[in-house]
Structure formats: structure tokens, C-alpha cells
Swiss-Prot record:
Gene3D superfamilies: Aldolase class I
EC id: 4.1.1.48, 5.3.1.24
Catalytic activity: N-(5-phospho-beta-D-ribosyl)anthranilate = 1-(2-carboxyphenylamino)-1-deoxy-D-ribulose 5-phosphate; 1-(2-carboxyphenylamino)-1-deoxy-D-ribulose 5-phosphate + H(+) = (1S,2R)-1-C-(indol-3-yl)glycerol 3-phosphate + CO2 + H2O
NCBIfam families given in the database record: PRK09427.1 (NF006945)
MF (Gene Ontology): indole-3-glycerol-phosphate synthase activity; phosphoribosylanthranilate isomerase activity
Biological processes annotated in GO: L-tryptophan biosynthetic process
Record's protein name: Tryptophan biosynthesis protein TrpCF
Stretch list, region Indole-3-glycerol phosphate synthase: 1-257
Subunit relationships: Monomer.
Function field: Bifunctional enzyme that catalyzes two sequential steps of tryptophan biosynthetic pathway. The first reaction is catalyzed by the isomerase, coded by the TrpF domain; the second reaction is catalyzed by the synthase, coded by the TrpC domain.
Region of interest (N-(5'-phosphoribosyl)anthranilate isomerase), residue spans: 258-453
């Protein structure tokens, strides 16, 4: 949002306030305001990292972000993962509305942040009248006197305050103003560029008892893991709103793109999905202790939401295509000596919507990851499903966005594994009671660790 755009927004906001005061005078509703709010501060302090997930239909820089902007559908996803939620209420530039707050609040139990351009005391009263639990105060548009005036009213109404800063000068002001929740906006308001390093730089100047939220530009789980050491949590909006599958997008950014492999029972598919997995692995390798037939796979995967991956090893291409099509697999994972020519041939026959993943047994060095027609790579130990790991140190200093890490991942080492900058983890023997029989407690615990560890 460039300076000229921001100035225009503030000008238009002033006019909106003038007209709204005529239509809905403060005297008409001030005495009707309920001061019983949900505790915004506590929701962000309770667990780290915390997540403020945002409802945003449009922005000045991106235009329409989400065409199917259904507040109830979005809420049904957010309520499972958010610490608090944020609702854009600016009408002209973000297609928001104050009425959204009550709709959302009826659907979720979390505190609701009203995100708008607050410049007038009237707005604070109005947002609370519409049941907002917290407000955003931007130091890029408020001077210290204005900030104090608005914050005093918010506190009298028992509302939380997210104080947003964009540079070191604004941060110094926020500290002098004793802001207890500071949001660091990673977006440059001059050229709209994103710099996540701003979170690292500014957070080092903030006292430890202040809650720090990183805002804007967060898109990947590895960014969450990297920045969590500097902040308490994240406000994420545009990235999530731009995704067709919102549930998958939220899971991806909070837990990573994780797969529970070796599934043999429908209950294990349900549990894996419930606790945060995106992918489920079905093994069609006959010498595997987790082997299942096509018929069994079809029976256990009815009405599932997991993206199912079929695991094959040096299999006849026609058999792979037959199973993949009949089971509507999301992808096929090749776990043998399949070469580039084999994969090219498979790609020509396999429906385009079905992904191809290639697994490698890692020893002393990393393989080439520029194969045509491969969508994802699996880095595994010599024998998959054996609960053994390769030497993960060889992954250091590599960006591995197209790699899922496999091999011996369990409750003891999953945090270490999650910090290796892979797209996600492949969980198998480390979450089992016995081969092919998953342990629900281990699955739940490992996903909790991946989120909060």
C-alpha cells in the first residue's frame, strides 16, 4: 500500500466516519455497549507460536483475493486452528463490513480483532458495539496523542490493542507508549515489497514481556519455524485467503506438508486427518509389512479428505495408472530404481492432475532435484518404514521446499526434523503400535509438537 494510497484511504475514512456519525450517532448506542469481551492478550500469550487468522476479501494491492468469501465456511476452518481471528471491516478498499464481526463471533470461540484504519474515538466505540474484542492501531497513521486517546477508550471497553509498526521510528514510539502487543508489518508501505528480515531486526529491540506478532508475507511453514524464535506469533491473511483449499493451506502453514504413510485402516486415515496431516500414504509394494490391495485401499478411503499418495516400487506403469485412476489418488510415489525415462513415460499416461513423487535413499550426498515431471522428492533412509534415519546434517544450509523428509521420524526427533527447512515430514513407523497399525496418541502428540515445539 503506497503512501499516496494510504493517504487516500485515510481521507476516505474520515468522510466515512462523518457520514456514519450522522447515520448512527454515538449517543444512540454508547450506553448499549457490552464491556464483556474475550481476552485477546491471553489468547496470544497462552501458547507459542500463536496465530491470528484473517478474513480478507480484497486489498488495494492485490484486488479481489477471495471470490467465494463465505464467512461461515472460513470460520469452520479457522476455529480449529486460530488463537484469535482478524476481520477486515473497511468497506471501500477491502470490501469489509462491521456486520462481519458478529457473524464470525457466532461461529468461533476465539477473540475477534477488528482490523480497520482507526483515527477517531467514535470508531472504537462502534467496533465494540459490533462486538469486536480488539482493535488495530497503526502508528503509520496515528500520532502519539491520537494513539493515547484511542487506546484509553479501548481499555475502558476491555478491548485488546494490536499496535502496528512498520519501521524503527514507529517501534520506538510504540515502546514509549507502552504497547503490550506489537505487530511488525513486514510490508514496505512505499513499494509494497515484503522483507521478513524486518521481523528479525525490530523484534530484537522489544522487551521480553511484550507480545510480538509478525504480519504480512508469511506463506510457508519453514518461515514460521525460522521466525518463531523472534516472535510470539503471526497474523496471516492474504496468503490463506488466496488458496482454493483453505483447510489444506492452514494446515500447511501451521504444521507443514506432512504425510502419514503406511495407512491400512480407515480409522487411521480419520485420525491422521483430524490432527493435521495433509497427505496419507497407501503402500502397494507387496513385500512391505504395510502392503494393502487396491480393494482394501478403496474401502478404507471412502469419504476421506486426506490427499492420498500411492507408494509403488519398480511397478508396471499400467498397474500404477490403473490404481491411481480408480482410487482418485492425489499422487504416486516411486520408491524404487525408477529413472527419468520411466517417469517421463508414466507422465505421458498418468492423468495430469495426479502428481509424481520420487523417493531417494540418502547416504552421503543429496541427489539432483531437477527431474522433469517430478513434483516432490522424498528423502528417506536406505529402507523405508524401518524407523531409521540417515545423517540429517547433510541437509543443513539447503532450501528444501520440494522435499518431504522421511525415515525414523518420531516424537523424540520431530522438532529437529521440522527445522531442516523441508516442505514437510513423512511419518510412518514412528507413529505406530505395530506395522500398519497407527497409534492415535503418538499422531496427536507429534502434530502438537510440530505446531508448538
Amino acid at each position: 500500500m503506497q503512501d499516496t494510497t494510504l493517504k487516500k484511504i485515510i481521507q476516505d475514512k474520515s468522510e466515512w466516519i462523518r457520514l456514519r456519525k450522522e447515520k448512527q450517532p454515538l449517543i444512540d448506542f454508547k450506553d448499549k455497549i457490552n464491556k464483556k469481551t474475550r481476552d485477546f492478550y491471553h489468547s496470544l500469550k497462552e501458547k507459542k507460536p500463536c496465530f491470528i487468522l484473517e478474513y480478507k476479501k480484497k486489498s488495494p494491492s492485490l484486488g479481489i483475493i477471495r471470490n467465494n468469501f463465505n464467512l461461515i465456511e472460513i470460520s469452520n476452518v479457522y476455529k480449529k486452528y486460530a488463537s484469535s481471528v482478524s476481520v477486515l471491516t473497511d468497506e471501500k478498499y477491502f470490501h469489509g463490513n462491521l456486520n462481519f464481526i458478529n457473524i464470525v463471533r457466532e461461529c468461533v470461540s476465539q477473540p475477534v480483532l477488528c482490523k480497520d484504519f482507526f483515527i477517531d474515538p467514535y470508531q472504537v466505540y462502534l467496533s465494540r458495539y459490533y462486538n469486536a474484542d480488539a482493535i488495530l492501531l497503526m502508528l503509520s497513521v496515528l500520532n502519539d496523542i491520537q494513539y493515547k486517546e484511542l487506546s484509553i477508550i479501548a481499555k475502558k471497553l476491555n478491548m485488546g490493542i494490536l499496535t502496528e509498526v512498520n519501521n524503527i521510528e514507529e517501534l520506538k514510539r510504540a515502546l514509549k507508549l507502552n504497547a503490550n502487543i506489537i505487530g511488525i508489518n513486514n510490508r514496505n508501505l512505499h513499494d509494497l515489497s515484503i522483507d521478513l528480515n524486518r521481523t528479525r531486526t525490530l523484534s530484537s529491540l522489544i522487551k521480553k514481556d511484550t507480545i510480538i506478532i509478525s504480519e504480512s508475507g508469511i506463506k510457508k511453514y519453514r518461515e514460521i519455524k525460522e521466525l518463531s524464535k523472534f516472535v510470539n506469533g503471526f497474523l496471516i491473511g492474504s496468503h490463506l485467503m488466496s488458496q482454493t483449499n483453505l483447510e489444506t493451506a492452514v494446515r500447511s502453514i501451521i504444521f507443514g506438508d506432512n504425510k502419514v504413510c503406511g495407512l491400512t485402516r480407515s480409522i487411521d486415515i480419520e485420525v491422521s486427518e483430524k490432527y493435521g496431516a495433509i497427505y496419507g500414504g497407501l503402500i502397494f509394494v507387496k513385500n512391505s509389512p504395510r502392503y494393502i490391495t487396491k480393494k482394501t485401499a478403496k474401502n478404507i478411503s471412502i469419504n476421506r479428505k486426506l490427499k492420498l499418495i500411492g507408494i509403488f516400487q519398480n511397478e508396471n506403469i499400467n498397474i500404477i495408472v490403473d490404481i491411481a485412476e480408480e482410487l482418485s489418488l492425489y499422487g504416486v510415489q516411486l520408491h524404487g530404481q525408477e529413472n527419468k525415462q520411466y517417469i517421463d513415460k508414466l507422465r505421458n499416461i498418468l492423468p495430469k492432475k495426479i502428481n509424481i513423487w520420487k523417493a531417494f535413499s540418502i547416504q552421503s550426498e543429496l541427489p539432483d532435484r531437477n527431474w522433469d515431471n517430478v513434483n516432490m522428492y522424498i528423502f528417506d533412509s536406505d529402507s523405508g518404514g524401518s524407523n531409521t534415519s540417515f545423517n540429517w546434517s547433510i541437509l543443513n544450509h539447503h532450501i528444501l521446499d520440494n522435499v518431504i523428509l522421511a525415515g525414523g521420524i518420531n516424537l523424540k526427533n520431530c522438532i529437529t526434523a521440522s527445522k531442516l527447512k523441508c516442505s514437510g515430514l513423512d511419518l510412518n513407523s514412528g507413529v505406530e503400535i505395530s506395522p500398519g497399525i497407527k497409534d492415535y496418541k503418538k499422531i496427536k502428540s507429534i502434530f502438537q509438537k510440530l505446531r508448538y515445539g
